[in-house]
Amino acid sequence: MLLRFFINQPRFIQFTFLRNKKDRILGLQLGKQPFRMSSSSGLKQQGLAQKKKFQLEFDPSSVSKNGTKTEAKVVGTEFGVLLVRARNTYFATAGKCSHYGAPLAKGVVTSDGHIVCPWHGACFNAATGDVEDTPAIAALRTFPVTEEGDGSLWIEVEDKNDNGASVLQPEGCWRNKATEVYNKGSVETEVTAPHVCIIGGGKGASVAAEYLREKNFKGKITIFTREDEVPYDRPKLSKSLLHDISKLALRSKEYYDDLDISFHFNTDVTKIDLAEKKIYCGSDEKPTESYTKLILATGGEPNKLPIPGLDSKNVYLLRSIADASKLAAVTTEAGDKKNIVIIGSSFIGLELAVVLKDHNVSVIGMESIPFEKVMGKEVGTALKALHEQNGIAFYLENSIKEVKTSSNDSSKAEHIVLKDGQSIPADVVILAAGVKPNLRYLGNAVSLEKDGGVKVDEHCRVLGAEDVYAVGDIAHAPFAGLPSSGEKSHTRIEHWDVAGNLGRVAADHILFGNKAGYTTKSFTPYFWSAQGKQLRYCGNNAAEGFDDVVIQGSLSDYKFACFFTKGEKVVGVCSIMKDPVVSQCARLFIKDAMPSKSQLKENFDVLSIPL
């Protein structure tokens, strides 16, 4: 029970009666701050929302054992929830993934209570709703479940959230854990207070910063970014040329302000003094900030080919919102179809080919089959055929001899001449020749790998640099190269999901790494791509390579799962139209429970393996 007395508003005195489980008053608490959490009666400071109980309608046989789930209808409403059976009890959560809204009932659930999204592998805790693996950043709302004597299940629901919407509606079914835990303005301001600086404004940076606050870290957090925007959903750039920050931002600037996360926008870090723990920006001779812990999350920068003419005004890159805006503008101008030449048959290059397929699109690549190194000859050939069905022309096993500029405008490319003599007309040229790690600001302070990345340990600590971590595209991390054998190999993975998970790894070690017996939580690298069909992939072919591919399903119908093997071990899995196979395999890798190559050749169903 709560009584509040207001004296000369807005000052007030708050009294709280403390009760035991039998509702007997045990004492009186005097507090100076307004309460934020709902009381036992369900009353809230704003809206006086009332908790209600709703019966669930579902098929009992669908949740008869641990590791099962179903979509349950909330009787008396138009909504549903995900009902999970795990750890010999029932859990109810929001039914859609907080990443892109995938139906979680079509994903997978483990017997110990992990919910995995069928589309992109985001993982949630069934009991708490907390995010355990990215790409999701918002937690699921959970609902207490009670079982009545007649076997019926009921959930307890607070009918309104702080925004006045039903918590069962899509806009109300997710939670932001960090703002629930951290109170704005509680950051420590002493000179000796801890200060985590993060260089880079991508997914790894955003996840690391938010995770620190989610665990109630009260030191300073500062993010340095070259861009003038908060971190945003970069994969959408190549999948749609979306360039509206309001639709791309992972979080609003106000959200970061509420977490006391500071930004240096439009800022280029040029030097780091590792000995003195100081960061220098631009041409400044004085350090901009000092840090106690540093996370490097600067990602990659596009490769530029040393060919005259590729600096023409109609040659475009795609790495930022500004790039997407320029490319969207030039490809939607009124007029006839444009001749668009994409240099590079990478995932991003061919995602752009899908977006621009209404134009005359040509793709130049050095390999004989797109994606062969990662996906194998069979899958690469099938994807190439799919693009050709959409009118995309390929010029493979080729390279650029020269770029011919317009006779009317020497600053504009007009034709791309290939080494075999073919000439391709070009109104728009897109350079999609991959990226390289952006670590110039380190100078010679740290030894780099051959490809320009930096080596880290299992906690993302940079080897040879005290209190420095690296995540994302720049980090050579010890991923599971052969997951089923437990072996590990350092490799650099340029995946959005990996960047986010490494950000969590680094932040977690900053907070808890000094505790006895500390270990880093494992995750399986997960990747997706829009290639005219939705392609999912998990594993790590890049670390160890593969020597065979087991195909289940039909490549020609684009409904298949492919298992990449080395010997009898599976090192990676991809699928199209076979959800949730890849999400299931992501968990099987973690549990060291993947079937063998021989089993898969006998058409063994990985979905039959209990998690």
Curated annotation (Swiss-Prot):
InterPro entries in UniProt: FAD-oxidoreductase/Apoptosis (IPR050446), FAD/NAD-bd_sf (IPR036188), FAD/NAD-binding_dom (IPR023753), FAD/NAD-linked_Rdtase_dimer_sf (IPR016156), Reductase_C (IPR028202), Rieske_2Fe-2S (IPR017941), Rieske_2Fe-2S_sf (IPR036922)
Assigned keywords, A-Z: 2Fe-2S, Apoptosis, FAD, Flavoprotein, Iron, Iron-sulfur, Membrane, Metal-binding, Mitochondrion, Mitochondrion outer membrane, Nucleus, Oxidoreductase
CDD domains hit by this protein: Rieske_AIFL_N (cd03478)
Pfam (any one): Pyr_redox_2
GO MF terms, alphabetically ordered: 2 iron, 2 sulfur cluster binding; metal ion binding; oxidoreductase activity, acting on a sulfur group of donors, NAD(P) as acceptor; oxidoreductase activity, acting on NAD(P)H
Co-factor requirement: FAD; [2Fe-2S] cluster
Protein's GO biological process: mitochondrial disulfide relay system
The record's free-text note on cofactor binding: Binds 1 [2Fe-2S] cluster.
Topology versus the membrane: Peripheral membrane protein
Entry's transmembrane regions: none
Flavoprotein recorded as keyword: yes
Disulphide bridges, residue numbers: none
PROSITE patterns registered for this protein in UniProt: RIESKE (PS51296)
Subcellular compartments: Mitochondrion outer membrane; Nucleus
One term under GO cellular component: nucleus
Binding site for [2Fe-2S] cluster: 97, 99, 117, 120
Chief localization: mitochondrion
UniProt EC number: 1.-.-.-
Span of domain Rieske: 56-154
SUPFAM superfamilies with a match to the protein in the record: FAD/NAD(P)-binding domain (SSF51905), FAD/NAD-linked reductases, dimerisation (C-terminal) domain (SSF55424), ISP domain (SSF50022)
Classification via PANTHER family: APOPTOSIS-INDUCING FACTOR 1 (PTHR43557), RIESKE DOMAIN-CONTAINING PROTEIN-RELATED (PTHR43557:SF2)
Function text: Putative FAD-dependent oxidoreductase involved in the resistance to cercosporin and other singlet oxygen-generating photosensitizers. Translocates from mitochondria to the nucleus under apoptotic conditions, where it degrades DNA and induces apoptosis.
Family membership noted in the UniProt record: Belongs to the FAD-dependent oxidoreductase family.
More about this protein: Present with 1560 molecules/cell in log phase SD medium.
Name of the protein this chain belongs to: Apoptosis-inducing factor 1
Lineage, opening ranks: Eukaryota, Fungi, Dikarya, Ascomycota, Taphrinomycotina
Gene for this chain: aif1
